[in-house]
Amino acid sequence: MKKMNLLVMSLVSAAALSFTSCSDSEDLANDNAGQAKADGFYMTLTVQSPNASGTRTSVLDPTEFATADEAAIKKGTLYLVDANGKIAFSENLSNLDWKGQTDKNESSKKDGNKTFKIEVKDVHAGNTYKVYFKAGDQLPTAEMNFKPTLSNIFATDKKFATPFAEAENFAMFNQNDSQVDGNGYTVTFSKANNNEANPAKVNYNGVAGSPIKVERVVARIDAPVNKSTQILASYPKNASEALKVAIDDAKEKVDNIELVDYAVANLANQSYVMQTWNNNQLSLPANTEYTQKGTEFGDKYFYKDNKFFNNEPVNYVFENNSTDNPTTMYFEYKVTLKDMANADFKEGANAGTFYRYNNVIYTSFDQIIKDYKDVPNFFGGKDAKTMKTELDNAINDDTKLSEFRKTYNIEVFKGGKTYYKHVIKDNHINGIIQRNSIYRLNINNIFNVGAQVPNGEPTENDYYYINVTVTVNPWVLNTEDVDLQ
């Protein structure tokens, strides 16, 4: 269940709109619309814009304003739904110029305030209708169907949810969680509402004129923020003796470790138009599939280069609650060692390559073999020159390189690259990421050199490689501080 202090900026746009009916439809952009009394009913709808703390009851600090592209609403659709779930009336709106607050200056917010004349053939006096507002012009997989709302699904064939996060055209819909009932907005028409001076108003929890709170359908994952370029001297909690040896060795030999790229894995391909919950658990549509899956990054020895690392400033994704395919961030770092004087790879395309054997870092096979000179048949009895030649023949072919690693049980950090991964989580709801939230990972500490490939297995547990801190915002900002090992 969403908590009070987890709430996301559910509304990024704003407007006070009056919807009126008459005997003939008119252009919605007509500023003179609604001036004459007409047959039918008048109705006022308000879409509330957020203030600095968002539109929900409470938002965690720190919060973060949307960008202008994320805050603007240029298009939208109003739905009135009868007691049987039938859409009694809908109207597409365009040429809107509403926008939510984008900085501390409240003048950055522009609330819409227009009167529209709309023909309302199918609403009747005395009847109550549920009211929904969809921002953006994106369409669900089938016609909007409120019998039940669960049938309304957004889907994409792209890796990310970018079609639903277009500049000035973000898909948004009624907020629906423990704080706000997305199905709770209603309007009831009476004969008195056939006059523009007395329009029907949207009701929520008995309050007439209530604004409809909407939220973005997508979540935002920002590029990670690296705050550490050195191996930390201290040990993570509950570190084993073997891990302490590895950390001490890395601390002694690593001069610098720099974040160079990242990737996001396990991207859901669909989402409900309105956020949906089942027994207080976030629900995803049936048969949700995932692109850029974690398994597609390779295995514990093999790096499968599918060009997933993108270094984009932001990524927009659908929410996710999968335990089998959790939304995960992979980090790629470049390690620079203090002493490469006698290294096997000092020059060329693979310069900086080093090894780790039995938790100890080496720059040459000669160093390793000297340390294990008393071990019978070490490396199958092969000398350093033979091992180097064998690696030279494998290092530029990821399949051959993975076989080399596996055969000799040695970690080869090609080009000095090392990898970490971390499951992205909401600050207060375990195991999910949810819409209208920003997820930003801060790398605070690095304890050890990571894995040789993205899916390399740590010798301890996941904490052995990474510790992260997350924040969420208005957008709700989830930041997670991460320690890498």
State the predicted function of each range.
Residues 6, 23-25:
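Charged, compositionally biased non-catalytic regions
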